[in-house]
Amino acid sequence: ASAGGGCRRGPSFSPGSIPSLAAERAPDPPLAMAGNVKKSSGAGGGGSGGSGAGGLIGLMKDAFQPHHHHHHLSPHPPCTVDKKMVEKCWKLMDKVVRLCQNPNVALKNSPPYILDLLPDTYQHLRTVLSRYEGKMETLGENEYFRVFMENLMKKTKQTISLFKEGKERMYEENSQPRRNLTKLSLIFSHMLAELKGIFPSGLFQGDTFRITKADAAEFWRKAFGEKTIVPWKSFRQALHEVHPISSGLEAMALKSTIDLTCNDYISVFEFDIFTRLFQPWSSLLRNWNSLAVTHPGYMAFLTYDEVKARLQKFIHKPGSYIFRLSCTRLGQWAIGYVTADGNILQTIPHNKPLFQALIDGFREGFYLFPDGRNQNPDLTGLCEPTPHFS
């Protein structure tokens, strides 16, 4: 459920032209932006990088900033979804798009690009609704869809209030409110990639979703059967039995890495992404601790452009590098590094776990200084099998 790179500025919502779902027969949507069906720019996030603070605290500090509504960890059951709720959500999405279209905001057209993401999300939801025409009750009772719609509503409202509170600071590219807008854009892109993964071509297939790594798939099947989505608390308890979580602090940091859509639930899609990123399964949490929690090169919720900007400081220190979840290919890593001739490149390692790519890159002289620091963590211990906890 990931898609390729190039983003372009798509046609957008035309204000006030949200279609009534009652007249949902028309194959061509009245929205100006509805023709904008293109590859989703999935995105990455969740960890210790952006603020420069490392460790568990840094991991959470960075991941938690944009969503201040997270006081509860046991979510209430999501409300039932009907057409009225979907239409209301579209109006909010429309409002967000109009706020982001303000020429003073001057958003860069690169992933994650909210002016593509929200129209694409609208488009995919239209496809879903057309597939469930006359069966809206089935859709409205689908737990995944209910959680998704409630989260979409929350995140759009949050974005609107960000503009309200940020005022003119929304026009400054390096302000904190703008950083939060980028994080929300990443969350929207994770949500879209997930929706397309669970409802490919508009039909629910969450119960047959294929988890890439066999041992991770076996864990999910044993713990949750055919469930598509489980509350964070249930997930944490099940995972703890196989991979012990050492503290409440570690649990919260783990949540900030795996809960890509920031809704207090873990979906089979998010679990698949996480287990691909931090493979192998046998040492999952050890890998995560070494690569995310304690590694100075790991960047949370950072985009391609932000990586370039961050490495600019180390342009005279070839071998400086940082890494993030790939924006365009969820489940893969992107490593940014400074070359000997003073260029900044970003590469996606294929067919090997991240720690192996970092070890190889260190030996070859490419990845020497994580976030410009002289001390590079030794990851060779991750090559050895984990002492297994039964």
Curated annotation (Swiss-Prot):
Region (4H): 77-205
Gene3D superfamilies: Adaptor protein Cbl, N-terminal domain, EF-hand, SH2 domain
SUPFAM superfamilies linked to this entry: EF-hand, N-terminal domain of cbl (N-cbl), SH2 domain
Gene giving rise to this polypeptide: V-CBL
Domain note: Is composed of the phosphotyrosine binding (PTB) domain, a short linker region and the RING-type zinc finger. The PTB domain, which is also called TKB (tyrosine kinase binding) domain, is composed of three different subdomains: a four-helix bundle (4H), a calcium-binding EF hand and a divergent SH2 domain.
Sites where the protein binds Ca(2+): 259, 261, 263, 265, 270
Xref: InterPro entries: Adaptor_Cbl (IPR024162), Adaptor_Cbl_EF_hand-like (IPR014741), Adaptor_Cbl_N_dom_sf (IPR036537), Adaptor_Cbl_N_hlx (IPR003153), Adaptor_Cbl_SH2-like (IPR014742), Cbl_PTB (IPR024159), EF-hand-dom_pair (IPR011992), SH2_dom_sf (IPR036860)
Alphabetized CDD domains for the sequence: SH2_Cbl-b_TKB
Region (Disordered) residue spans: 1-52
Domain of life: Viruses
Protein's name according to its UniProt entry: Transforming protein cbl
GO molecular function: calcium ion binding; phosphotyrosine residue binding; receptor tyrosine kinase binding; SH3 domain binding; ubiquitin protein ligase activity
Binding of 4-O-phospho-L-tyrosine, residues: 324
Biased segments, Gly residues type: 42-52
Keyword set, alphabetical order: Calcium, Metal-binding, Oncogene, Repeat
Region of interest: SH2-like: 279-381
Miscellaneous field: This protein is synthesized as a Gag-Cbl polyprotein. This protein has one functional calcium-binding site.
Region (EF-hand-like), start-end ranges: 206-278
Signal peptide: none
Disulfide-bonded cysteines: none
